[in-house]
């Protein structure tokens, strides 16, 4: 892709677009930057629609946009949305040489509603009038009009201008064109450096995505496939406002509190909305978090009324704060427990010979859970490949978020490259592909979601539906197919003994 090197236009440059008006004062749309491009009008419109629907691409202060009105959708569905319900909606401006093609109204949702409120904005898509059959220029225009009347009303995440215009010009005969950005300033508005930088940034996003499409780029990562984005983000915002500050201020681990708190709040929000789809709001079978680490996710979910517990081979300082007494069908227990997993497929033969003394059976969990218990495996490392296997044994739905690559023996290893050559060949991509295949072999429909969490290890694999003849699945055969368990028992014995030593000290 050619480097982004825009031409900065002079303050007195000739306007790229002219707004028609019946009054004396013509709105002055001032061009700021222009760049040559090789992406056509179809790509330009696709890119602009994507940016309209996903404003977070341009601003990290924004979560998303909720589309409140769309003439194309309304026409297709025969619907009439009363604009009177949307407050003060700007009149549709006319531009010389252009006809209105589509009108959308979006609500910009900020990440922090404590800092700024959502803002409605009209987005207008225009096309040039007349025929281009003789090789004339094709012109397309996209206008953003915030629903505010003064600079003081403008939220922090939006440039303080009355309007933003993106203009695309294309020559079919030369198969090349240009794209530019213009501002409609408030009255008496100047051209401060900050607004100029923002204009360059906005144009760069259009150029980058447009040229990427023209060069054959295809998006690999798709979000919000299992649960709608707005539901997860609304729940996340509510959780953040309820818990984030207190959790960060009371952090006792040596790790970065902000990363862990916000990441687990995101995962909790996703799980809460996923569980709403699976179970409704009146029933929840409980959950178990295998390899629960600091126990924060278990703590948040319990606070929200979703009862469950977690275990890990090593206890954490934070457990003293997060662990609570939990009523279960088998009695009252701690919500966070120090246990080592010894799954049913791992033979216990010879345990007396290798354990000698100091092996405590009560520190071992066999990985069997009550039917229907939702299994959480969040960066569970050694337990990650076991997750779909344990789920199949106990008939439990699950979510698995892989991180570090381990085989079924618990040893570190590099998973084989994906068979699908279109997928990346990285260690993480290989791990995700490998555990996804285990999931499918265990009779689960492997649904995948790219979580919006502050981590590059953000792929979630959800197993909530069975497929094929589940009764014909032989877990032992599957375990052997993926490398077997040689050495796992010895690792468990060492972990249990180290746990004993920790308790003595």
Curated annotation (Swiss-Prot):
Any single Gene Ontology cellular-component annotation: cytoplasm
Pfam families recorded: AdoMet_MTase (PF07757)
Molecular-function annotations in GO: tRNA (uridine) methyltransferase activity; tRNA(Ser) (uridine(44)-2'-O-)-methyltransferase activity
Its EC number(s): 2.1.1.211
Superkingdom of source: Eukaryota
Catalytic activity: uridine(44) in tRNA(Ser) + S-adenosyl-L-methionine = 2'-O-methyluridine(44) in tRNA(Ser) + S-adenosyl-L-homocysteine + H(+)
Cystine bridges: none
BP GO terms, sorted: tRNA methylation; tRNA nucleoside ribose methylation
Compartment list: Cytoplasm
Keywords recorded for this protein, A-Z: Cytoplasm, Methyltransferase, S-adenosyl-L-methionine, Transferase, tRNA processing
Similarity-based family: Belongs to the TRM44 family.
Cited function: Probable adenosyl-L-methionine (AdoMet)-dependent tRNA (uracil-O(2)-)-methyltransferase.
Protein name (database record): tRNA (uracil-O(2)-)-methyltransferase
């Amino acid at each position: 892709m050619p480097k982004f090197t825009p031409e900065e236009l002079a303050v007195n440059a000739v306007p790229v677009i002219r707004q028609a008006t019946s009054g004396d004062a013509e709105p002055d749309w001032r061009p700021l930057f222009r760049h040559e491009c090789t992406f056509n009008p179809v790509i330009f419109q696709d890119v602009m629609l994507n940016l309209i629907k996903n404003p977070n691409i341009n601003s990290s202060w924004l979560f998303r946009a909720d589309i409140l009105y769309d003439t194309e959708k309304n026409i297709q569905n025969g619907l009439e949305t009363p604009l009177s319900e949307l407050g003060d909606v700007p009149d549709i401006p006319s531009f010389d040489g252009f006809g209105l093609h589509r009108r959308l109204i979006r609500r910009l949702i900020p990440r922090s509603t404590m800092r700024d409120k959502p803002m409605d904005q009209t987005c207008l898509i225009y096309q040039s009038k007349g025929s281009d059959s003789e090789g004339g220029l094709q012109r397309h225009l996209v206008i953003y009009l915030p629903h505010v009347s003064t600079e003081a009303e403008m939220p922090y995440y939006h440039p303080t201008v009355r309007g933003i215009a993106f203009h695309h010009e294309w020559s079919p005969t030369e198969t090349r064109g240009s794209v530019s950005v213009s501002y409609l300033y408030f009255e008496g508005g100047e051209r401060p450096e900050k607004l100029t930088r923002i204009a360059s940034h906005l144009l760069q996003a259009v150029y980058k995505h447009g040229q990427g499409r023209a060069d054959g780029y295809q998006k690999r990562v798709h979000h919000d496939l299992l649960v709608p984005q707005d539901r997860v983000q609304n729940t996340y915002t509510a959780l953040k406002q309820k818990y984030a500050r207190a959790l960060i201020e009371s952090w006792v681990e040596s790790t970065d509190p902000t990363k862990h708190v916000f990441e687990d709040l995101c995962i909790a929000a996703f799980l809460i909305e996923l569980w709403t789809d699976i179970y409704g709001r009146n029933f929840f079978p409980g959950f178990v978090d295998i390899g629960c680490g600091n126990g924060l996710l278990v703590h948040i979910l319990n606070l929200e009324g979703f009862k469950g517990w977690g275990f890990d081979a090593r206890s954490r300082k934070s457990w003293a704060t997060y662990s609570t007494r939990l009523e279960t069908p088998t009695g009252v227990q701690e919500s966070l427990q120090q246990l080592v997993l010894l799954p049913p497929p791992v033979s216990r033969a010879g345990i007396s010979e290798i354990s000698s003394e100091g092996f405590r059976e009560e520190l071992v969990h066999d990985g069997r859970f009550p039917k229907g218990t939702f299994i959480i495996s969040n960066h569970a490392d050694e337990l990650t490949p076991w997750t779909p296997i344990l789920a199949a044994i106990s008939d439990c739905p699950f979510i698995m978020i892989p991180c570090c690559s381990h085989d079924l023996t618990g040893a570190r290893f590099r998973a084989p490259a994906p068979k699908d050559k279109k997928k990346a060949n990285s260690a993480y991509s290989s791990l995700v592909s490998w555990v996804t295949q285990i999931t499918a072999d265990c009779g689960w429909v492997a649904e995948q979601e790219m979580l919006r969490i502050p981590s590059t290890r953000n792929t979630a694999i959800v197993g909530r539906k069975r497929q094929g003849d589940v009764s014909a699945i032989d877990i032992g055969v599957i375990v052997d197919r993926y490398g077997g368990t040689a050495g796992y028992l010895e690792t468990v014995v060492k972990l249990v003994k180290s746990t004993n030593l920790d308790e003595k000290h």
